[in-house]
Each structure stands twice: as C-alpha cells, then as structure tokens.
C-alpha cells in the first residue's frame, strides 16, 4: 500500500546533535586533536578584561579550520554551512538551536586580532610541536614552491611614479583641469588599454594589491600574471608541513631563499634539523646547494646538465644511492599537497590582498 506524508509536524524532539554526525566522519578524528584551553591561553592577551563577553575564540578558530577542511573559501558560505551542516556545527560546538554568527564576525576578527598578532601561526606551530613529541615527523624533508594568483587584475598595474617638484605637480594639476573642462575622453565604461606597452615588476605596481607582482615559472610558453610565491617544507613520512609561507615574487629562483628561510625557522622554533632534502631541478643552483651544505643537510636534488661547480658535482655524485631515489619519489607528495590546496581549499587564488593578509 502506498504511504502518504502526514501533514502534522511534531512540536518536541528528544535528540542530540551527536546523532547527526556519523561515527566515521573525518571531523570526529580531528576534533580531539584541537585543545580549546590552548587556544584560549594564546588569545587571552587579545581581549579586554572588561566589557560584554565575546564569541569564544576557540569556536572562531574551529569554524575557520572546519571551513578549510571542507573546502569552504567564503565567509558567507561558511555561515550558511554552520546553519545547515550538522557535522560542522558539532565540530564548532554550536547547539541545535544556536544561530551562527554574521559573516562580518570572521572578517572583523581577522582585522582586529588575527592578522597582527600571528595567533594562527602560533597555533599551527603547536600542531607541529605535538607531532614532534609523538615521533610522527621524519628527519627527511621535501621542498617545493608554487605560484598563487593574487586578487588583482592586469588592469590594476600602473607605472611607478617618481617624486615631482612642486612646480611640476602644479603644472600637471592644471593640465588635468583643462582635460576635465573638455569633457570625458571615454564616455561610459572606461577601459584600460595596455596593448603594446612594456610592463614589468621594475616599472609597474598594482593599485589593488601593491605587494603582488607579475609572476611566471620562467619556462617558454607560460605567461605572467599577478600573484605571489608560496614555499613549503614537508616531512616525508606523513606529509606534515613544517613550514608554509607566502612571499613577494622576486625572480624565477625566488623559491630558493624562501625554502632556506623555512628551514632556519623550523630549526629555531622546533629545534628540528633535517638530515636530507629532496627537491626538483628548479633548485639545482649553486647558491641554493651551497646554502643546504652550510646547514649540514644532504641535498637530494634532481640534477640538471648545466652547472660545473664543485657543489653541482657533489649533488650529482649522490644520484647513485638509494636515499636519493627515495627522496625523489617523495617529491610527488608535496606536489599533491599543493594540488589539493588549489583544488579543494582555495589556494588557486588568494581572496585577500596584501602580503600580511594572504
């Protein structure tokens, strides 16, 4: 017999939010690893001792982490998911009858607390330290870099203006006033036509994001676009990132200085000293190899045909051993991390502007 839906709804329900989260849900395994007391201790100095109680900082942090884990790259979409996604609501600690916050809550807390204090970076370091204590981190690392598009367009780049003397500035103002009296030269929607003009990082800057640059891998057939360089250091056993940092693009070899800085940071903050370092051909440069040797790390770098210095020769000699082969096999792991970040976690293009905020 065909059933039919009852038109009467129940007024009372006896249930818990736990019932809506499957036992094998990934967020269930991650939630016990995040300690609310640690977050509150790190954030205590960012709040006033008087006034109206704020949203608990651990809930804000859990909402951001949960959004990134689920590939949510918009604050408004995150608020919508907090309303209807029971697993995310349970992860953050909201009850069934609790309303999520406004989207501006996240942007205002980033601007007032998170950007300047570096609190998110400190919490990331706490995760790495805990992994070191549990002996989950190998002493063999892989390094790589990628280019991430900035939240700026080609048309936002204008020539860098040099300082003018007062008379020249007044003359320029008078000429612009004359042009205004003559009427608009391009009525309607004004466009920026830069065809035929030579534009580069030495002569142009973006009005939208002054820290971004024209970035390119330096290979034939690849055009430049506004973006940043993102470097990472990964341990080879469990694909844990020991360091990740966005930097202003300097040249096609700017990844090298960023990677060495991340190695120094890991040694300074975690007392972590790598034994070997795997990298692709893009790092087969004399200065980078010399920097790796100075840090007493064995470079397992893919060798190129160019380069005849003693540093290049020492790297080529290591290609014959099994450790080199294993390090090269692990390179795909860090490339997969970048691929997953761009595909699922919004790393393909930054939403915010400025080096401090990206």
Name what the model sees in each region.
Residues 166-167, 179-182, 286-356:
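Helix-centered, glycine/charged polyanion-binding patches within enzymatic domains
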Residues 83, 92-291:
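Polybasic low-complexity intrinsically disordered regions
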Residues 69, 84, 88, 129, ...:
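Short, well-ordered loop/turn and helix-capping segments at boundaries between secondary-structure elements
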Residues 51-55, 278-286, 305-307:
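Acidic, metal-coordinating catalytic cores used for nucleic-acid/nucleotide bond scission
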Residues 1-35, 174-194:
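Charged, often Cys/His-bearing segments associated with DNA-binding zinc-finger transcription factors
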Residues 63, 78, 102, 232, ...:
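Hydrophobic, well-ordered secondary-structure elements that form the walls
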Residues 22, 26, 51-59, 71-74, ...:
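Secondary-structure capping and boundary motifs in well-ordered enzyme cores
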């Amino acid at each position: 017999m065909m059933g039919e839906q009852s038109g009467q709804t129940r007024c009372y329900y006896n249930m818990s939010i736990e019932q809506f989260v499957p036992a094998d849900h990934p967020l269930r395994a991650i939630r016990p690893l995040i300690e609310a007391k640690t977050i509150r201790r790190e954030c205590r100095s960012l709040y006033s001792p008087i006034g109206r109680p704020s949203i608990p900082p651990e809930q804000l942090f859990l909402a951001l982490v949960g959004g990134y884990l689920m590939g949510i790259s918009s604050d408004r979409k995150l608020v919508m998911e907090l309303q209807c996604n029971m697993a995310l609501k349970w992860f953050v600690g909201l009850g069934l009858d609790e309303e999520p916050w406004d989207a501006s809550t996240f942007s205002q807390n980033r601007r007032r607390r998170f950007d300047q204090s570096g609190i998110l970076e400190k919490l990331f370091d706490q995760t790495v330290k805990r992994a070191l204590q549990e002996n989950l981190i190998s002493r063999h690392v892989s390094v790589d870099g990628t280019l991430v598009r900035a939240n700026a367009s080609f048309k936002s780049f204008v020539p860098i203006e040099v300082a003018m003397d007062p008379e020249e500035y007044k003359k320029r103002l008078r000429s612009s006033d004359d042009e205004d009296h003559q009427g608009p030269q391009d009525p309607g929607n004004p466009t920026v036509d830069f065809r035929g003009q030579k534009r580069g990082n030495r002569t142009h800057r973006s009005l939208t994001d002054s820290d971004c640059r024209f970035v390119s891998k330096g290979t034939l057939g690849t055009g430049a676009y506004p973006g940043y360089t993102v470097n990472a250091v990964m341990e080879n056993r469990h694909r844990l990132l020991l360091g990740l940092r966005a930097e202003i693009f300097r040249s096609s070899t700017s990844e090298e200085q960023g990677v060495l800085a991340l190695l120094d940071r890991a040694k300074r903050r975690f007392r972590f000293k790598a034994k070997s370092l795997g990298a692709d051909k893009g790092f087969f440069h004399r200065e980078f190899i010399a920097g790796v040797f100075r840090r007493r790390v064995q470079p397992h770098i893919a060798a190129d045909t160019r380069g005849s210095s003693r540093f290049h020769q020492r790297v080529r000699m290591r290609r014959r051993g099994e450790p080199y082969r294993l390090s090269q096999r692990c390179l795909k792991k860090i490339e997969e991390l970048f691929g997953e970040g761009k595909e699922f976690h919004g790393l393909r293009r930054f939403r915010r502007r400025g080096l401090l905020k990206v």
